[in-house]
């Protein structure tokens, strides 16, 4: 059996300092590695009050520097926010400096309110209907 941990730098309210949240998150990642978990996942979120997670590659690079075995996954990178060449470069570099530990998750995002802030006018649900076209373009 394999175990995985999806964790964000999240807080329920602003009574917790984000540096404490970050420290606690790293401790959870290290405990997961020590406990034999095979993947830890970091998300991409923008302008949400509960979290600071604008770039999962930055979070995973930090975790890579503090771990040695656990695989590092993006859960997920929002395809609509990235140019494909930049995205490929970010993923390739993280995989290189982490010793080949990247698990790459690409998706359409979670919240329309993030799209409203990041890509005004683009509906998150529109991306759900273009997966066949995306699959063809990746072949």
Features from the language model and the residues they span:
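Acidic/polar active-site rim loop that often engages polyanionic ligands
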Residues: 111-121
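Single conserved hydrophobic/aromatic residue that forms the stacking wall/gate
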Residues: 129-139
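Glycine-rich anion/phosphate-binding loops
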Residues: 80-92
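Residues at the N-termini of beta-strands
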Residues: 39, 101-103
């Amino acid at each position: 059996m394999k175990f995985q941990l999806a964790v964000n730098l999240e807080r329920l309210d602003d009574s917790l300092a984000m540096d404490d949240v970050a420290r606690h998150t790293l401790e959870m990642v290290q405990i997961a590695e020590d406990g034999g978990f095979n993947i830890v996942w970091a998300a991409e979120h923008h302008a949400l009050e509960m979290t600071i997670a604008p770039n999962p590659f930055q979070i995973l690079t930090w975790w890579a520097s503090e771990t040695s075995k656990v695989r590092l996954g993006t859960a997920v990178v929002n395809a609509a926010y990235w140019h494909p060449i930049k995205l490929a470069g970010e993923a390739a570099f993280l995989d290189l400096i982490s010793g080949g530990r990247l698990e790459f998750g690409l998706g359409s995002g979670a919240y329309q309110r993030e799209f409203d802030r990041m890509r005004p006018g683009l509906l998150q649900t529109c991306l759900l209907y273009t997966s066949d076209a995306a699959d063809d373009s990746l072949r």
